[in-house]
Amino acid sequence: MPSLKSIRKRISSVKSTQKITRAMKMVAGAKLNKAQLRITELRPYAVKVQEVLSAITRDAAPAAEALAAEGIGAEGEAGAPAGGEKALHPLLVTRPERRVLLVVLTSDRGLCGAFNTNINKRAEREWKSRTEAGQEVQLAIIGRKGRDYFNRRGAPILEYLAGVWDKLNLETAQAVGAKLLAPFNKGEIDAIYLVYNEFKSAITQTVVVERLLPPAGGPAKEQEQGDEGGHGAPSAASEFLYEPDKGALLERLVPMYVDISILRALYESMASELGAKLTAMDAANKNAKEVIDNLTLEYNKARQAAITKELMEIIGGSEALKE
């Protein structure tokens, strides 16, 4: 049986760890409330932007396919608009997906349960399945956990975006978007997909693979877990009137769509990380309490045994003196 001193040390050590996990749980809970508020405010706006863009894309899809087939740029030959109106924005022209960029959103730190494991494994499956299908796949990694994971596996990392989580705002999303758009605008990439955790609740996060560019005409989200009614599904029934024209609207709408989509994915991922961390720290607190209770019981038993032994020795000595 361990000595009383060693048991006391173990109890003290577990209590110190419990203080840390309790503090981390409180911090994660406070940050999660703010992150949830941001998502609640941003989701309807992002969905409406995608809805309008999808409507324009569906209307102008035949013109885009004709331009792509003829190898003509978005402005057409000699800058002539296609179909009597301004042609599609260059970022909307769909090309065969031979070269794909997967943008993987992970965290910089651990202690958040299976958050990083789930996203990394899903991204790895996507990378390998597309590679086996004959596509050239490259990765853009956000978060040190993703970088370390794919470096160990020799994955083709095109870009590692550091410091994104240090200051998460629209300017950060725009900077990320600029780096992702550079190879797409040069024709080095045919499609860009976001791989991230979508926040459902503090205990539930769903890994999704969502096409960023070119935007899909309908719901472009492929979920890891079956979930009905995804937040990103645009309404096909909506009809819009465009002023002054679709082309002028697209010049402003497409960059806005890219920035908002990236910002939303970043907020979703951050909230998912905080939810996973909150759950993990709550479980750690409960486990620590259970360990402390067991060690306290063991300590009391050992102390009782020691006291009983001393009493027996005293009684035995007293009886010996009487004799």
UniProtKB/Swiss-Prot annotation:
<dbReference type="Pfam" id="PF00231">
    <property type="entry name" value="ATP-synt"/>
</dbReference>
<feature type="compositionally biased region" description="Basic and acidic residues">
    <location>
        <begin position="221"/>
        <end position="230"/>
    </location>
</feature>
<keyword id="KW-0813">Transport</keyword>
<keyword id="KW-0139">CF(1)</keyword>
<comment type="similarity">
    <text>Belongs to the ATPase gamma chain family.</text>
</comment>
<dbReference type="GO" id="GO:0005886">
    <property type="term" value="C:plasma membrane"/>
</dbReference>
<keyword id="KW-1003">Cell membrane</keyword>
<comment type="subunit">
    <text>F-type ATPases have 2 components, CF(1) - the catalytic core - and CF(0) - the membrane proton channel. CF(1) has five subunits: alpha(3), beta(3), gamma(1), delta(1), epsilon(1). CF(0) has three main subunits: a, b and c.</text>
</comment>
<keyword id="KW-0472">Membrane</keyword>
<dbReference type="GO" id="GO:0046933">
    <property type="term" value="F:proton-transporting ATP synthase activity, rotational mechanism"/>
</dbReference>
<keyword id="KW-0375">Hydrogen ion transport</keyword>
<keyword id="KW-0997">Cell inner membrane</keyword>
<keyword id="KW-0066">ATP synthesis</keyword>
<dbReference type="GO" id="GO:0042777">
    <property type="term" value="P:proton motive force-driven plasma membrane ATP synthesis"/>
</dbReference>
<comment type="function">
    <text>Produces ATP from ADP in the presence of a proton gradient across the membrane. The gamma chain is believed to be important in regulating ATPase activity and the flow of protons through the CF(0) complex.</text>
</comment>
<protein>
    <recommendedName>
        <fullName>ATP synthase gamma chain</fullName>
    </recommendedName>
</protein>
<dbReference type="InterPro" id="IPR000131">
    <property type="entry name" value="ATP_synth_F1_gsu"/>
</dbReference>
<feature type="region of interest" description="Disordered">
    <location>
        <begin position="215"/>
        <end position="237"/>
    </location>
</feature>
<dbReference type="GO" id="GO:0005524">
    <property type="term" value="F:ATP binding"/>
</dbReference>
<keyword id="KW-0406">Ion transport</keyword>
<dbReference type="GO" id="GO:0045259">
    <property type="term" value="C:proton-transporting ATP synthase complex"/>
</dbReference>
<dbReference type="InterPro" id="IPR035968">
    <property type="entry name" value="ATP_synth_F1_ATPase_gsu"/>
</dbReference>
